């Protein structure tokens, strides 16, 4: 069997890590899978991997010693395909191709060179453009990411394959009594904006907000909303599947590819309220609304969904099978194993 490696900067719960875990489980019967990351965490404890390698230097923008450690792992384990799923990991995965031969796949989960670049955005985009020359496949998870790759970064179209993210079927929401429970699931770091949603709901006592996720902003957010009885922080939850216990899923963020938590909520058949960024629009088909990242628009759209809730829930039920992973399995395997 082939030996396939996944390299991701961090191993804590997040969209890229969830993606690595789901894809690994999908292909595990057809190849040996290895994980390379910078730290122990949620992902390294999964039993799907034949080997797990921790290289702390992957967190750094560039380090020669890290590059040679990666080369050694690839050669000693005869890894023929390496899939990078985060920005820093993507830099090392492409540069190590100068030292060893393998099939290199880079997965964009929102193009951090655009949303994290700041004043250096143009430089990071140039770097990403030239790194693409060392990449066999640029895997875009949404049409929005594909468009940005071509128009904003300048990546050549033949390098790009666009296949949507997808997730296992979540437990579906049945006809339960409406409780006006709103759910946010995401890592509490940039570019997520849970504070906008919390500010809105703190002023609307008819709703309750339940925030699932850890991250560097968790404690400061808990302190900020400590006196709000309808704002609840559940912290980091391993293997969260309980979307069906809530009435609405909302993800407010400054940037997304095609968010894994949004996909999970979609398959659970609950209405969605999502920021109009990245590929989020691909999840909305009458089953929810897109918002600008302002409190006024979030509040207005939140009320609009609950005022016509049965219609949005009916559309959510109809759409819930679209992003189930079994529908995309052959396409994923073709990219990785083909």
Curated annotation (Swiss-Prot):
Its EC number is 2.4.1.306. It comes from Escherichia coli. Disulfide bonds: none annotated. Belongs to the glycosyltransferase group 1 family. Glycosyltransferase 4 subfamily. This is O-antigen biosynthesis glycosyltransferase WbnH. Involved in the assembly of the O-repeating unit during O-antigen biosynthesis. Pathway: Bacterial outer membrane biogenesis; LPS O-antigen biosynthesis. The keyword Glycosyltransferase applies.
């Amino acid at each position: 069997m082939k030996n396939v490696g996944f390299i991701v900067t961090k191993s804590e719960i997040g969209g890229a890590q969830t993606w690595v875990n789901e894809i690994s489980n999908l292909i595990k019967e057809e190849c040996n899978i290895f994980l390379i990351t910078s730290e122990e965490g949620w992902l390294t404890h999964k039993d799907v991997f034949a080997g797990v390698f921790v290289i702390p230097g992957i967190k750094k923008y560039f380090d020669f010693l890290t590059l040679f450690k990666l080369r050694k792992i690839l050669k000693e384990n005869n890894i023929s395909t390496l899939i990078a799923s985060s920005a820093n990991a993507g830099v090392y995965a492409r540069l190590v191709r100068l030292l060893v031969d393998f099939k290199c796949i880079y997965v964009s989960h929102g193009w951090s060179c655009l949303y994290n670049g700041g004043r250096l955005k143009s430089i990071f985009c140039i770097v990403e453009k030239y790194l693409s020359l060392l990449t066999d496949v640029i895997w875009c998870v949404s049409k929005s990411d594909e468009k940005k790759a071509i128009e904003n970064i300048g990546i050549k179209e033949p390098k790009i394959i666009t296949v949507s993210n997808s997730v296992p079927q979540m437990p579906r929401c049945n006809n339960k009594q409406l409780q006006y429970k709103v759910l946010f699931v995401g890592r509490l770091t940039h570019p997520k904006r849970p504070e906008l949603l919390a500010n809105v709901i703190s002023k609307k006592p008819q709703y309750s907000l339940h925030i699932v996720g850890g991250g560097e902003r968790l404690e400061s957010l808990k302190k900020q909303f400590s006196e709000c009885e309808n704002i609840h922080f559940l912290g980091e939850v391993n293997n969260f599947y309980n979307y069906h216990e809530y009435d609405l899923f909302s993800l407010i963020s400054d940037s997304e590819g095609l968010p894994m938590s949004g996909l999970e909520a979609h398959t659970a058949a609950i209405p969605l309220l999502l920021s109009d960024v990245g590929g989020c629009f691909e999840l909305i088909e009458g089953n929810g609304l897109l918002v600008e990242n302002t409190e006024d628009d979030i509040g207005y759209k939140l009320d609009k969904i609950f005022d016509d809730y049965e219609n949005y829930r009916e559309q959510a039920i109809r759409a819930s099978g679209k992003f189930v992973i079994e529908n995309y399995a052959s396409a994923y395997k073709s990219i990785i194993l083909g």
